[in-house]
Amino acid sequence: MNITITKTTHPGTLPPSDQLGFGTVFTDHMFLMDYSADKGWHDARVVPYGPITMSPAASVLHYGTEVFEGMKAYRRPDGGVQLFRPWENVARLNRSCERLGLPQLDPDDALQAIKTVVKVDENWVPSDPGTSLYIRPFLYGTDPTLALHGVHEATFAVILSPSGSYFKNGLQPVPIMVETEDVRAVRGGTGEAKCGGNYGAANRAGDRAIEKGFSQVLWLDGVERKYVEEGGGMNVMFKINGTVVTPALTGSILRGVTRKSAIELLKSWGVPVEERLLSVDELFDAAASGALEEAWCIGTAAVISPIGALGWGDKCYEINHNRIGELSQKLYDELTGIQWGTKPDPFGWVCPID
């Protein structure tokens, strides 16, 4: 794929790491590529970061024809830059496109686009411990009509944001609350797709949890309101009597790349792993009896976020004395070591941008 590159005439500078939050600072450039039913994907380009123009009737603004991904670029100790399993993100992006009726991308072209814009803005990849360059690929429908039909015009874009360390004071466990009113998704819906509507619709429950003193919610299935599905924006895992249990991918849960990586790591260590239905009753019985030894959320942003307490109605149980568990810490250390290039990568997960 031929990508034209137009560089900015007013380059910015990477702020100090202690001034980096998440998603508030953006690099100098972005990638754009357009789609039309008659031309297919065309006009791949890296251009200066700036506003995007579209018709007020664009389908994304009215019917939510949008999907996105979240991934990172990491600065290695030798100064090089690498990605972590980017082909998994590209595959998931295409699955999301299929579900939302959006045009899919050639996987090689999508990866080339990501690597190219990261390479152009390579000087924006921070090097301090725990920092990274967050990558947000997204794809949206631009048909200039209010007619409700499949997408005939679209844009694929990639923007970049240098991000600070998620845990500035170490891995501090957080309390989470079982959500009993709202549901995130149902089988046959868009729960397995990474689309904006899933996240926007979750805000109300997240706000309620924070008002009650919790960090985020723990979602239950949308039919029986009985089975644990995932955290507010991440997958979840529980160590129960020595076995790591994580909700099965039933079609309403996001297929997390970090989740998949953790399962492969755990199995390589000989740790029993079960992907299955886990009822909230079973989970809280395990918490009450002490069988629940560790719990953590898992995803791209935090990698591992230990759960220190579980709330459900009038019940609230502390987990592992509100401390990060040994296995949670080991997973975090191994995953981040591979991502930042401080540990060997026996799985072939990393992808240099060169």
PLM features: residue spans?
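Extended, Lys/Arg-enriched charged tracts that mediate electrostatic binding to polyanionic substrates
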Residues: 126-136, 140
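Helix-start/capping segments and mature chain N-termini
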Residues: 1-117, 138, 145-354
